[in-house]
């Protein structure tokens, strides 16, 4: 009975609640395979990929820095994607409904969350135009440091 209730609740959370994801896109669940496809479909634009969680206080501080990056570099120059590692998608969806991002967001599926279970949040991976990794930043890094590395991937 508990599994049935959990399944119904998950369905309601994933398909019935408002699904604001930032940048006008619906919030979707993303798998390892889908995330790899997103990383490699860059059409020559670099990517800032940030892993976060709704319960993570440093993620909320870091988000402000990412919003400033978006203000400097429009989508036409820089792709940005936030992937929630919340095991329960409800809090992440509620957080994004209250405070939408200016760039797309996704909820990691169980496989992706399990694969990243030891990863600290926030973790930001900066991909160059050729889809290779420029830098991995862990934690709430300074605005200056973030801006420096993002500038490098945009200019290359």
Report the location of each language-model feature.
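Conserved redox-active cysteine motifs that mediate thiol-disulfide chemistry
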Residues: 51-68
